[in-house]
Amino acid sequence: LYPKIDEFELLNRKTLEGYFSGPIPFTGKKLTFNSSLRYSSQDGYLYGVKEHSVHDHANFFTDNWYIEMGGTGDTVAMNPSASLNSLLKLTYKVSPRIKFSGQYLGSNGESKSYVHYYKYNPDGRSQALSNNHNTSFKINHAIGKKTFYEAHIFTNYTDYKSFQFKPLDLDSAIPFSSGDNFGSDEDLLLFIESPGQYQIGLNNITVLNDNTYILPNSKYASSQNILGAPSSPTFSFGGSNRGHTYRYSNSLGGKFDITSQINAQHEVKSGFQYRIDKLNERIFSILYDSNTYRIPTIAPENASPSHSYYSENAIFLSGYLQDKLEYQSFIMNLGIRFDSFDPQSTYIDSLLNPEAGVIKSDKKNMWSPRIGVAYPITDEGILHFSYGHFYQMPTMRNLFLTNIFGAGLSPTIGYSDLKPQKTVMYEFGMQQQLSRFIAINGSVFYKDIRDLLALQSINYNSPTYGPSSYAVYLNKDYSMVKGITLSLTKRRDPQTKTSAFIDYSYQTTEGNSVTSGSFYFNALTGEEEEKKIVPLGWDQSHVFNATVSVTEPGVNGWGLSFIGKLSTGWPYTPNIPFAGYVPLPNSDRKPFQQSLDMRLFKNFSLSNIGFELFLKVYNVLDQRNERYIFNDTGRSEYTFINRSLQETEGFKAHYGDAGVHTWDE
């Protein structure tokens, strides 16, 4: 069931880290650098078996099923990943009052996600590449003894690709005319401007649309290689995921902050930020069925559901003013923040007739008051209180996602007039030092979160296509979080060399919920799905964390740490067969979750270079947490449902055939 689950692999996860810092030679120690590099890779813990290849054929239209087994039979890692993270910072100290710095942060990653359907055809999965580059330049200037400012500009570029075989760049496609010789490069991408008959190699094909792309030499397998399907759900017998996603985002902005100690009681801070975000996303699927699309084809953008593209900009502007008041009897922080967001786009004018037209999105302006008070009750104890408003804008994908309306389609679209998520938070707590090394902390908190996003399904009567439906992201959700946290901190003392941190949290997280996972409205009948207040999917009522460390600091120091966690399971919606009623959403909980990790290290130096040897052990007790469960039992180990009853007699007749796997697998 789980290939290689009992095998121990010492090198499954590999990490290499390096840190370098110091002054640049010949600069009089005015120019310094700080750099780091980290490479990590792992095969993951889920494996498949390569029984099939992408180009295998199968036929399920006959009683005697035909199934090709073109794979090597090798065991293949199904969720591998690798990443490279880098940092370089240069700092130039012009004078004691002026300092310039520049910083680069980069990350590159590649991964494949586990897809159960492709367990026996692992080459059919997509792969993902991600790159992120962040550059910033900053100046710190102390104007006087009591005032200083920071100003910096920054850029952030993100590039994400998900594809099969190799990434495709439509801008690099070669214009094609019928009969042209295009060679045998398997990565070749051709662009055909007009519909018609075309001679492409040995194939005479019909191009149906303007601005079509074709891949005449690609390795994609036709969907007709697999004829029919077994009468019960099973695994992939060949073929691949032909979907592609390309997402590029770029941010450019600047920020200015100034701080001034006006007098002994007032420290004033103020600042503003301006940022422009750009996002474009292209999502398409390769069409190849040996009939309508006899050569792997990419349909024109935004002309069919198989190819969508959008490019949008948004502007963010924010500013704040804060005053820190320090008196002998209390400390208070008073502040107000202003945020403005301009999506610079359009959205559908009528939710009940999304094809009617679009109107311009409104600019969103938000004011956020905030206050924090600390009141000493003894020389070693403090009471504190805070209250504030916080806003979070939706992701740009939820604002701008583009799709196609049409007969029989149920597209999901973005809505650029979304409001920001609003959180109002209250917290009251106490800190008390019990001794030189031990302190306790306790607080109660409450969060009121409104305008959360929900995916609303809407049925409407299309003037073009008749009864239709679509889904759109809207501000429909609400949640409430309340709870208490208690913690105990023990600083390291020279005698025992031990430090510890223990905390316990109790909280409830409730909000709107619907059984389908999205709000539903039928414009034809006026019916809307009933809203219920239930525990949300990420709610964990009880969480206990503990960290205990024994350390000896220094160049030749050592240390041993244990990190443990115990928590209640997440909510789930039970399914009770033949019970005669439908349970409320998230009305039961998964089993407790627990973990214990360990870290051991030893420092040493060689030729004035510091080294650290360390050992990390995750899940020391080899505890198997039940994160995914059967919703009739609430456990992952068993179910009352006989899975074989879900398989037809026609399917059972092929038990034991090569390539046929049961539901239990």
Residue ranges, per PLM feature:
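Outer-membrane beta-barrel channels and translocator barrels
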Residues: P25-K29, S95-R97, G144-K146, N263-Q265, ...
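Membrane-embedded beta-barrel scaffold of Gram-negative outer-membrane proteins
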Residues: E150-F154, P376, I382-G388, Q392-P394, ...
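Gram-negative outer-membrane beta-barrel transporters
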Residues: F445-I449, N459-N461, Y465-P574
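C-terminal beta-signal and adjacent terminal beta-strands/loops
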Residues: G557, I563-A579, K602-E665
